[in-house]
């Protein structure tokens, strides 16, 4: 494999099925999260759910969460107001075998 090969997360995650509980997100960010802590999550989240646009605004959407707990381990005591597994029948359904 070439050292310059990239992996498109969206394609890899596209085979999974997500059952989103729109009214009850399982991850809630603090009101004004520390930007340095947020940058940790931008780099570490395997689903790429933590993003910053060109204007510097930060964005997060728990709908594509893999429930791996990386954000909880890295920033659970700093910028996450809540992290819990989704209620029964909600969350990710891994379909890649």
From Swiss-Prot:
Keywords for the protein's UniProt record, in alphabetical order: Electron transport, Iron, Iron-sulfur, Metal-binding, Transport
PROSITE patterns: 4FE4S_FER_1
InterPro entries, sorted: 4Fe4S_Fe_S_CS, Fd_FixX
GO molecular function: iron ion binding; iron-sulfur cluster binding
Family that this chain belongs to: Belongs to the bacterial-type ferredoxin family. FixX subfamily.
Function: Could be a 3Fe-4S cluster-containing protein. Probably participates in a redox process with YdiQ, YdiR and YdiS.
Name of this protein: Ferredoxin-like protein YdiT
Species of the source: Escherichia coli (strain K12)
Gene: ydiT
